[in-house]
Amino acid sequence: MATAFAWKVFGPIFAEHSKEVIRRPHLRQLAFGPFIRYPNRLRADLLWEQVAGGAVCPGFGDALRATIRHDIRERLGDIEIPTLIVWGFSDRVIPVQAALSYHRRTPRSRLEIFERTGHVPQLERPARFNALLDEFLAAER
């Protein structure tokens, strides 16, 4: 509830001044803390390119709306290929319990949960994520 209120109040201002927000650690924590467990561990340029910059890309709003409108959970059982699910234990956007549910519903899935990681494990723990992805893809060849 507090996060929703904060984003209603501060979100437009953060968006308007996003490059400055990213450069200042206390503002970066305030703006991205709800999504990324430790946003100050990420390089500012990477945070801009992969997170904030993506939010202003054409199509981002449409993609987010589609995600909200369409519940994919009932279709997870239709996935026939090996699937790697990577989740941050400290994800504040979609709780880790959802990952457990998705894993149970998805045949041939493998679930990896990263401790001390939030909503974007590929950015928060890139070395571990990339090694895991390399290993998963090599095993599936």
Region annotations inferred by a language model:
Residues 1-4, 45, 82, 98-102, ...:
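Short, glycine/charged-enriched secondary-structure capping and boundary segments
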Residues 1-16:
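Flexible "cap/lid" loop of the alpha/beta hydrolase fold
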Residues 18-78:
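Conserved alpha/beta-hydrolase catalytic His-Asp/Glu region
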Residues 79, 85-87, 91:
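Short beta-strand/loop motif that positions the catalytic acidic residue
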Residues 92-98:
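Conserved alpha/beta-hydrolase "acid-adjacent" motif
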Residues 77-80, 105-106:
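Short, conserved loop/helix-junction motifs that constitute active-site signature segments
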Residues 107-141:
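Catalytic active-site module of serine/aspartate enzymes centered on a nucleophile-bearing elbow/loop
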Residues 30, 62-66, 100-101, 128-135:
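Alpha-helical elements of Rossmann-like donor-binding domains used by nucleotide-donor carbohydrate transfer enzymes
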